[in-house]
């Protein structure tokens, strides 16, 4: 979508020139398959973006595209884990948790880290994608959902009077203090107490932040709230902006639910790239573009970093028999694109290159460790110095690797 390869279209129907059979998830290497979407140069920058995302394409001058991302895995769950935490195994803190731990919160009434999942379900690996791992529990993400109850069980099932609630909370606070003192300031207990105290404050903040009635009709229209195709992502993008305005440090939106099913409710286009990606792109294109416009209009884009990522890309060859050009594509961890916009990156630019057909990164490959190190740098944090002692090791988000990608910095 962001890496134009005219040579791929020219070589449509030919075999991938490779001495060794490609290492891919399902192992079926069909013939090369050109893009289903037209590419054009966009804006003053001339950045190449395909018609898959027509609205985002019109904001090309805001984007900083990395075309040479590489991952450690071509399997959804470990690939998601490494993109979120830097490790293929679960149990490690996510990027949002590290930022919460390192920078703290800018608000007492909302969490520092919020996740807004797709209405169709969560990603592979579930909550491990936004886990606080071995960091203190208060740095775990809080999930907000659409509908009348963004946070489950935030209010009592049976309403009680204000007086009864106040007296109950006072007693609970007293008991918590005594229990904490007797435990020797146990960190897990302290995190649980803080989480429940935050939940009490969220009884006021969550209904307010999730109420869009004060938003102008033009804003709701821009985000696509009246269109059933874009409504879910539109609501979440708008909620994300409202959360950022109120001091939430890191907001993470997921596009796509579980990978199983037919038709798939995710981007996992093994059967048909054109059919699948058209449906999924239509759900998010308009809301994401509206979010970029809204942040810029409000003067927020200068100090907000927008990340548009995927755990891996798709192969330039079809997922089919060796002599066919099938409609689907397999997973590609060797070279794919992500983009950033906003705080501290160079707008209207592209960094890195894949080979002539978009199979592997050949210039300035960027690992997830590099990607995370760069994000930390943009937040004013040295990724090598933000550590937490666990199980005999000073752990960090980037493990023992990671270099800041200076070529994308403004």
What are these regions (language model features)?
Residues 1-410:
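Ligand-binding pockets and gating/stacking loops
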């Amino acid at each position: 979508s962001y890496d134009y390869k005219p040579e791929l279209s020219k070589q449509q129907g030919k075999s991938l020139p490779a001495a060794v059979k490609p290492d891919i998830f399902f192992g079926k290497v069909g013939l090369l398959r050109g893009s289903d979407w037209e590419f054009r140069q966009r804006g003053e920058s001339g950045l190449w973006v395909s018609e898959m995302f027509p609205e985002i394409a019109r904001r090309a001058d805001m984007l900083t595209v990395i075309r040479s991302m590489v991952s450690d895995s071509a399997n959804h769950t470990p690939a998601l884990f490494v993109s979120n935490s830097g490790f293929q195994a679960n149990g490690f803190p996510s990027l949002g948790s590290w930022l919460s731990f390192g920078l703290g919160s800018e608000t007492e009434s909302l969490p520092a880290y919020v996740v807004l999942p797709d209405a169709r379900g969560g990603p592979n690996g579930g909550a491990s994608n936004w886990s606080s791992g071995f960091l203190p529990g208060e740095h775990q993400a809080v999930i907000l959902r659409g509908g009348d109850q963004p946070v489950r069980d935030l209010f009592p099932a049976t309403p009680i009077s204000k007086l009864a609630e106040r007296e109950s909370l006072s007693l609970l606070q007293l008991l918590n203090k005594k229990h904490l003192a007797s435990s020797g300031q146990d960190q897990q207990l302290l995190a649980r107490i803080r989480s429940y105290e935050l939940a009490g404050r969220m009884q006021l903040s969550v209904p307010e932040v999730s109420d869009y009635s004060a938003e102008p009709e033009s804003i709701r229209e821009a985000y696509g709230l009246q269109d059933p195709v874009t409504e879910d992502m539109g609501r979440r993008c708008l909620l994300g902006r409202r959360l950022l305005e109120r001091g939430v440090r890191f907001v993470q939106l997921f596009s796509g639910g579980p990978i199983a099913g037919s038709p798939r409710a995710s981007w996992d286009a093994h059967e048909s790239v054109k059919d699948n990606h058209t449906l999924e792109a239509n759900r998010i294109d308009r809301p994401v573009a509206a979010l970029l416009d809204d942040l810029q209009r409000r003067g927020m884009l200068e100090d907000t970093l927008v990340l548009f990522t995927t755990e891996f890309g798709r192969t330039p060859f079809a997922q089919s028999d060796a002599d066919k050009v099938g409609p689907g594509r397999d997973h590609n961890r060797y070279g794919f694109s992500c983009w950033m916009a906003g705080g501290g990156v160079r707008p209207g630019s592209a960094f890195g290159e894949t080979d002539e057909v978009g199979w592997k990164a050949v210039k300035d490959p960027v690992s997830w460790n590099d990607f995370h190190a760069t994000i930390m740098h943009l937040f004013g944090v040295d990724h090598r110095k933000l550590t937490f002692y666990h199980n005999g090791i000073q752990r960090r988000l980037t493990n023992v690797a990671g270099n800041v990608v200076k070529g994308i910095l403004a």
